[in-house]
Amino acid sequence: MSLESFDKDIYSLVNKELERQCDHLEMIASENFTYPDVMEVMGSVLTNKYAEGYPSKRYYGGCEFVDEIEQIAIDRCKKLFGCEFANVQPNSGSQANQGVYGAFLKPGDKILGMDLSHGGHLTHGSKVSSSGKNYESFFYGVELDGRINYNKVEEIANITKPKMIVCGASAYAREIDFKKFREIADSVGAYLFADVAHIAGLVVAGEHNNPFPHCHVVSSTTHKTLRGPRGGIIMTNDEEFAKKINSSIFPGIQGGPLMHVIAGKAVGFKHNLSDEWKVYAKQVKTNAKKLGEVLINRGYDLVSGGTDNHLVLVSFLNKEFSGKDADIALGNAGITVNKNTVPGETRSPFITSGIRVGSPALTARGMKESEFELIANRIADVLDDIDNSSKQEKIKAELKELAHQFIIYDKAMF
């Protein structure tokens, strides 16, 4: 029996979500459109198989084929990032980070990460996260120019003496200097951990410098700029570290891995290894730069004054309206973004003084500079007259027509 026949409620909602994704312009920087073949393998019989352990070292029988699948995913991941060891089992980026901490740290150890309000991530030591509850966390941020001051990071590291320094961000538009971070880590005897969840797709295409060989350990998600399934990975060049990481993931924080998702990761990695991927990643950066240029020309402030990657962070510290106001208004105009804190934040995390806008998903739909120029101008049109609902409706209709020129899925399930 088909899903449509058996469960009309879920079938209907899934297809409404397809309609939303097709009609709206998805510009949340952490979201992307994965490949139909990734979704196809995730809907396969692999979802039935338990496979606790690792390839050739399982606690269940009948794993001969999933062993091969996981090994393919591991090998492709290592080739992508140019590393020696990879764990492809983490169910998410947050669990990957939890696995890293479990492998390298003891409860109460000190970590130094990027402040959440300056572009960091919850799992980099925020007090509301287990990373901030289990470990003593300290933070670095950005200067008034919106950029990391590595001399200031070094000063903080020398004062706090962390056991681990975390580099990487969820809302930082500039390139990260992993080499400089390693110099700082070495100066205080700390491990260097890079969370490249947001920039991984650029890294593997050569559009952002690689955390290897500078970092002791690297984590990432497999969605976002990699366009694979939702999940996490951990990588290192050190065999002893790899053993600790494996134990930290299983049996440390996870049981049986999601083999259908690991297969999806393998398929996604094959896309990432292609020549077409390099073209895509380059276009992601080009589109983000065009987006930023237009917004600046329209009078909007970008944190750091531009972008080196896939996102721009727009600050409304000098505006009467908030990030939440902008999020809602743009949503009414058919543009999906997210409210975001900015350096110098004066509002609560539920209101914020900025928005984060990304290019990966629309680039996946085939849009280029001309489309991004148009969209950026429409974003500015909405923000210039933020309470004008009739203008928002008019722009929504215009952008729906644009979206329908770049349909990425013709059905909701594969």
Curated annotation (Swiss-Prot):
Residues forming coiled coils: none
EC number, as in UniProt: 2.1.2.1
Functional pathway: One-carbon metabolism; tetrahydrofolate interconversion; Amino-acid biosynthesis; glycine biosynthesis; glycine from L-serine: step 1/1
A single cellular component GO annotation: cytosol
Site (Plays an important role in substrate specificity) location in chain: H223
SUPFAM superfamilies the record matches: PLP-dependent transferases (SSF53383)
Residues with N6-(pyridoxal phosphate)lysine modification: K224
GO biological process terms held by the UniProt record: glycine biosynthetic process from serine; tetrahydrofolate interconversion
Cofactor(s) required for function per UniProt: pyridoxal 5'-phosphate
Residues given in the record as (6S)-5,6,7,8-tetrahydrofolate binding sites: L116, G120, H121, L122, E240, S348, P349, F350
InterPro entries the record matches: PyrdxlP-dep_Trfase (IPR015424), PyrdxlP-dep_Trfase_major (IPR015421), PyrdxlP-dep_Trfase_small (IPR015422), Ser_HO-MeTrfase (IPR001085), Ser_HO-MeTrfase-like (IPR049943), Ser_HO-MeTrfase_PLP_BS (IPR019798), SHMT-like_dom (IPR039429)
Name recorded for this polypeptide: Serine hydroxymethyltransferase
Organism from which the protein derives: Campylobacter fetus subsp. fetus (strain 82-40)
Gene name as annotated: glyA
